[in-house]
Amino acid sequence: MNPRRLSLVGLLGLIVVGLTTPAFAQTTPNAKIDRAVRAGLLSGARTQSVIITVKPGYRETIRQALQQHGDRIKAEHPLIESLTVDLHSEDVAELAKQPWVNAIAADAIVSAKSDLSNLITQPSQTLATTLRPTLGLPPLPTSSTMTGATGVSVAVLDSGIAPNDDFTGRITGFYDFTQGGIPTNPYDDYGHGTHVAGLIGSSGKLSNYQYVGIAPDVHLIGFKVLDGTGQGKTSDVIKAIEYIIANKAKLNVQIVNLSLGHPIYAPAKDDPLVQAVEKATAAGLIVVASAGNYGQVQKGSGSGYTGITSPGNAPSAITVGAAVTNDTVTRDDDVVASYSSRGPTWFDAYAKPDVVAPGQALTSDTNASSYLYKLLKGSQVSKNGQQFLTLSGSSMATAVTTGVVALLVQAHNQSGYHRQLPLTGNLVKAMLQFSAIRLPGVDRLTQGSGEVNAAGGIVLASAINTSVADGKWWLAN
């Protein structure tokens, strides 16, 4: 037997000596190892970057054992009792045998969820004339009650936010988790996050109010977790979520936008990114996540199922697919985009997405020096002497939905019924689903409960009294 492996087994044995070990339900060791890690083992990789989730109370001891064994601890995640480790592949199986190890998952690459393949020849669409009206909103906000104002803040976990006059005074924080989570001046070298932020809350000033976001007064907090190529690490996204939860009151954040993800490699209970999202929801945050862009089995071959990505498979997340409005206000001609991921989810067979929202060919803010802007020359839009970009995907639909959620939170805050209990993620999801408009001839695993209806959701959010006693009606009138 390999002496290195013996060393790790011996060190792990100290855990049994040093700790009172309760009886654990036994799980087949191989079932603890996710698909990506197993693929790495089959490929012969010497080491793998993994996220090890352990039973409560064992994280510190396992960290010490791994360090003594020469494995590099890259991060700890107290939120989900996990460690990110550069682990020798030959030790994966031994770790999985330990009863205090719950799961071993890859520190998977996450990426932005825009469908670049659908954009090269895609003509630009006009945001102001159809996007807001198809949601039941006026083309331009007519009062302060539908702007996302009154202290509503959204955490945008993406490639960054490039500051411009559409966001003046409303980017209230920026943290670069591709560089360890340092606070810094806002920037976006990839361009995806700026586009997402614009859909959520652009004032429209730069475009002479042609491209106004859904909640144009909302505050934005940027968390850069994707690099200049639009990719990042799961562990960095988890660290950003941990920071948001720990500083929720200081940041005054209510909503988290996750227009990113990776393929599902494990059941939700063993997926560290999903578990971080579940903790965020439990902490009172409203998490909106993209369904993914894997709706086609192969490009041009029709729509397929089970394409939902992580963390869109998080039970508590509001998971959003992309709809095509055909640039009309009416819903009569709306369809779900062919690329929009369908449910059910792998492993757990959860019914996702929860809703769909406009996500096809939406024009929004950009950074002219960003990777995406330079790449997608056919998607560049010039308006009022300024540059914008047209993108499609569940990322865009997620941003639109996040803007709608900001309006719901504002409507509830202004109703006077919020003083005891704010809106929760599950309640907001229920309101979006109840008020959504079903698309005819489309199944539930494709459209969820239907296409988001902002006007209907605002009415519900304004009427719900969350301070009433258990067993009483929440609707005020």
Q: What are these regions, as identified by a protein language model?
A:
Residues 180-182, 261, 332, 336-338, ...:
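Flexible glycine/proline-enriched surface loops and loop-helix/loop-strand junctions
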Residues 58, 203, 207, 225-316, ...:
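Substrate-binding/access-modulating region of protease and related hydrolase catalytic domains
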Residues 127-140, 374-385, 423:
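Surface-exposed intrinsically disordered loops and tails
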Residues 31, 35, 60, 64, ...:
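Solvent-exposed, polar/charged alpha-helical surfaces in well-ordered, non-transmembrane soluble domains
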Residues 38-39, 253-257, 357, 384-388, ...:
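C-terminal subdomain of the subtilisin-like protease fold in secreted/lumenal serine endopeptidases
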